[in-house]
Amino acid sequence: MKLKEIDRTAMQAWSPAQNHPIYLATGTSAQQLDATFSTNASLEIFELDLSDPSLDMKSCATFSSSHRYHKLIWGPHKMDSKGDVSGVLIAGGENGNIILYDPSKIIAGDKEVVIAQKDKHTGPVRALDVNIFQTNLVASGANESEIYIWDLNNFATPMTPGAKTQPPEDISCIAWNRQVQHILASASPSGRATVWDLRKNEPIIKVSDHSNRMHCSGLAWHPDVATQMVLASEDDRLPVVQMWDLRFASSPLRVLENHARGILAIAWSMADPELLLSCGKDAKILCSNPNTGEVLYELPTNTQWCFDIQWCPRNPAVLSAASFDGRIRVYSIMGGSIDGLRQKQVDKLSSSFGNLDPFGTGQPLPPLQIPQQTSQHSIVLPLKKPPKWIRRPVGASFSFGGKLVTFENVTGQPQQGAEQPRRQPVFISQVVTEKDFLSRSEQLQHVVQSQGFISYCQKKIDASQTDFEKNVWSFLKVNFEEDSRGKYLELLGYRREDLGEKIALALNRVDGSDVALKDSDRVAQSDGEESPAEEGQLLGERIKEEKQECDFLPSAGGGTFNISVSGDIDGLITRALLTGNFESAVDLCLHDNRMADAIILAIAGGQELLAQTQKKYFAKSQSKITRLITAVVMKNWKEIVESCDLKNWREALAAVLTYAKPDEFSALCDLLGARLESEGDSLLRTQACLCYICAGNVERLVACWTKAQDGSNPLSLQDLIEKVVILRKAVQLTQALDTNTVGALLAEKMSQYANLLAAQGSIAAALAFLPDNTNQPDIVQLRDRLCRAQGRSVPGQESSRSSYEGQPLPKGGPGPLAGHPQVSRVQSQQYYPQVRIAPTVTTWSDRTPTALPSHPPAACPSDTQGGNPPPPGFIMHGNVVPNSPAPLPTSPGHMHSQPPPYPQPQPYQPAQQYSLGTGGSAVYRPQQPVAPPASKRYPNAPYVSPVASYSGQPHMYTAQPASSPTSSSAPLPPPPSSGASFQHGGPGAPPSSSAYALPPGTTGTPPAASELPASQRTGPQNGWNDPPALNRVPKKKKLPENFMPPVPITSPIMNPGGDPQPQGLQQQPSASGPRSSHASFPQPHLAGGQPFHGIQQPLAQTGMPPSFSKPNTEGAPGAPIGNTIQHVQALPTEKITKKPIPDEHLILKTTFEDLIQRCLSSATDPQTKRKLDDASKRLECLYDKLRDQTLSPTIISGLHSIARSIETRNYSEGLTVHTHIVSTSNFSETSAFMPVLKVVLSQASKLGV
């Protein structure tokens, strides 16, 4: 699909891949003339803007040259890391000269753009190429077999790759190898190609076609394979592209015969080796797969030949072609629609003519219509197959913070037998699309930090493009200056100096500056308020200054006067004054329309009378400024704001600025702004922003600005945020208000702004601008994402934890062990027989296992009645027993010098329910070492402290204190008849030699077979001391939370008959209550035959030999077991909950199991069925690895391929894939399941299922 077009007969060169934006340089082509027959030459640079739908390319610069060019390339030499316009333009001239240009100077308009030039060659320079490994090396070819290697760092003297080839001939094309930096190839029109080794300074191989009709017009190396190259022929008798492999240089590896006439140029894509461009004399531009010869794409061109074609280095889907009709066209191989382009051309043509009447018909021209028959050709199809850069496994995804995560299929040979799979790189890039937006945001942040608000506002005033923008920033600037109200008045056009001059002229005075100065001082000192005394003083000063000749009160020595008491108005006034009736006197004066006398008498009558008189005066007065005087005198500023004509909004705002009190100033400005918004036209609506700035109302300013301005682009939002931030700072400094409170609209805009900053990678700035005191879900979510992106915790939120970390422990209870981790996961509820075992790994500590009787022990001590509540996040299973008897608090005793007689309480342990077993003596043979948690019916049952070892031996946890013996009212069971312990082991461990005996009368239900381990479900059981069967390579796993250290196999040997009951505790009375029924329950034993010390163990065991203090964990062959396993029953194993297989790999298990079942249903041979049963069991190892996700991606991919072959019943293909996996992967990864899988595939193939 054609994207752009340039009307030039020129050679072309794309800017390097590092350069952004993309440029295309053109130089006037030699030996060609355009339609104007101009002999001038030029070098131009165009910018590729794919966002512009037009065909035109923007010309960035033009340089008039005295040379015409046969070849033009743009090398990345001295390219800076920022990707600015740089590099070197290298041109091959028609007179044997090579010229180096600086493209950055050409774009800048500099006249000195030539870096260097040499005319070393004989004849025109038709071949040029830059070494991609050493970009300072340039190869050039010309006539007489001349090949030179130029060093751009030392351009004076070139090098030669070796002696000239004989006979001398022209060099039509030259190319550096794409994999080996010292290999160079050249070709001539005679059809011969020569490969040079610069280390040896000689040709190493020559390639030529035996037909002697091969005229080379193009040469290109394979982008990935160092020994392969293609040659193009321009001979019409042999219009082919030959692909050669230098390892088999006797004949071409492949020949592409897709052109009907000679080929003029070729270009091999560096991004996809399966894309080879070629253009020929048949006016076709083809994109072919050189490996298969298939034509993947044919570009829609005209009937003109193309003599040069090139891929864009930065955008691999874009290419350019220069044709003999004087045009350079830019195409895309990804296809698209040309409807928009056609419509744009039609609109352009219509706009040129408009609706004029060029033919004098008196009728306007109808709109130009697009021919309907061309609509079916409006869609240009892309390549037949996706190119490599968008082909799997390649992908890209944007993540939060403007990050672009990409991955690609990196070529490389897998290492045989390597322990680690080959790593595939994932690239994380920061995408910045709004550079101006980021720059202005950073400037705003700097201003806020440096407090340089006045200078910032002044810069904005100077840079303002409109008067309104200038006024807004002027009003914002005034907030940070002294006498802000006076400055506001000046901005509204009311300068006091100008007013004083006008008043002086009106009073025939010469200088009015004194009047203005005194007015200014009066307003500044009063701050909008005037007392009657101040008014009188001002009036007296005015009278004195004007030096009035008349006196209101003549002195007594001025003569006598007559006091009239006649019946007229004057007499009545006189009588009222003589009797002190000022109200009547004032009414008479008003009745006689003597307003001045009424006001003067009202002043003498007091403030109340004066106010009544003023109202009556204003009611009768009908002058133009009566309402203004009324508002000023009555201090009714709201009247001015609500009733004035909106055309006089400046005057109303000036009155408010002059007279309003500070507590009502903001409200009046808001009221005026609201009137301008609701009642005014579009021009007046924008002026409301000035009122809101004076009021300091940020929320109203945001609403008004949003209505008046277009906020659809980031820079418009930046304009608003700048004003909002500056105004908030001004309000914070001048009005001392809480600016942290934001409204819904402002919060939305700040959230949008923070989102934009985050999208550009400015996470810290986005978090700084995000409002803090809002609970809007979008803002809370954004704040959480920003904090997580910075690796910080969310303010005001604590991470949810189910462990006890940071929670205070109940008094009397032990804390966690020092130096041992605490597990934060609460155990899942499972079912076991009713024997309570203290887990070794809990939510508090890692401890030695301790077996407890089934009845509940006493609750943990607490200083408060009812016990301490469980910490937050703790999950309580079952019902709480509130009336558990509490023993005395424990206290620290001797540090491991003797075993503790009673368990140390562990409060708030999650309890779980056990089921009782019946009949038979089931043997406990766990595959994994587990221990059940406490009983569900006693959720407050404390954990038991670890039992110390024998005297004289160190405890395994030296940080664990032992408690002193205390009395307890809890019932005590009798001694056991035999030692009871757990037998621990790995997979296939031998069973325990002893188990717990159930109390008489206890009934229950045995666990289901599905809940038992495999060792209890299938096959005969081994003896207790047989060696374990190693069925797979063991690997070290993380200990589970309920892990219990092993009880040594010597337990029944060292203590075959059990321990006698201590005499000191036999006579203790049992407590009343339901627990007395458990008195006959046997006492469990600990490791090494040691009985449980928590309830019935004596205070010390001094007679134990030292050799028994450290249990022996190795079994004694042939040791007698006696009657130790009679009348006892062991605990069933814990049902181990396995992680689910990931959904994407669940198909593997389904497919394999289904295949085994099909084979079992078809098999008749018992031996075959045994193999399949064994395979079904051994494939569990594969499923475990899938759950743990420990298999390499290569093996996973191969297993899915095998599953697909099973679905299609192509077992031979599955066996082939199986062989490939085994031969290319690590043996230790596949040895456990791949042989079994091969057996299943072989049996399926044999049975034909």
Swiss-Prot record:
Annotated positions of the Phosphoserine modification: 526, 531, 799, 1192
Sequence intervals crossing the membrane: none
Biased composition annotated in UniProt, kind: Low complexity: 961-970, 991-1007, 1056-1074
Keywords associated with the record: Cytoplasm, Cytoplasmic vesicle, Endoplasmic reticulum, ER-Golgi transport, Isopeptide bond, Membrane, Methylation, Phosphoprotein, Protein transport, Repeat, Transport, Ubl conjugation, WD repeat
Region of interest: Interaction with SEC13: 161-470
Keyword Membrane among record annotations: yes
Post-translational modification Phosphothreonine, affected residues: 1190
Region: Disordered, residue numbers: 790-829, 842-940, 954-1123
Entry-annotated residues carrying Asymmetric dimethylarginine: 423
Protein's cellular compartments: Cytoplasm; Cytoplasmic vesicle, COPII-coated vesicle membrane; Endoplasmic reticulum membrane
Biological process according to GO: COPII-coated vesicle cargo loading; endoplasmic reticulum organization; protein transport; response to calcium ion
InterPro entries the record matches: Sec16_Sec23-bd, SEC31-like, WD40/YVTN_repeat-like_dom_sf, WD40_repeat_dom_sf, WD40_rpt
Membrane topology recorded in Swiss-Prot or TrEMBL: Peripheral membrane protein
Region annotated Interaction with PDCD6, chain positions: 800-1142
PTM characteristics: Monoubiquitinated by the BCR(KLHL12) E3 ubiquitin ligase complex, leading to regulate the size of COPII coats.
Location of cross-link Glycyl lysine isopeptide (Lys-Gly) (interchain with G-Cter in ubiquitin): 647, 1246
Biased composition (Polar residues): 796-805, 1013-1024
Superkingdom per UniProt: Eukaryota
PROSITE patterns linked: WD_REPEATS_2, WD_REPEATS_REGION
Chain positions of WD repeats: 4-47, 64-111, 120-160, 166-206, 209-254, 258-298, 301-342, 397-429
Keyword Protein biosynthesis assigned: no
Subunit relationships: COPII is composed of at least 5 proteins: the SEC23/24 complex, the SEC13/31 complex and SAR1. SEC13 and SEC31 make a 2:2 tetramer that forms the edge element of the COPII outer coat. The tetramer self-assembles in multiple copies to form the complete polyhedral cage. Interacts (via WD 8) with SEC13. Interacts with PDCD6; interaction takes place in response to cytosolic calcium increase and leads to bridge together the BCR(KLHL12) complex and SEC31A, leading to monoubiquitination. Interacts with KLHL12.
Designated name of the protein: Protein transport protein Sec31A
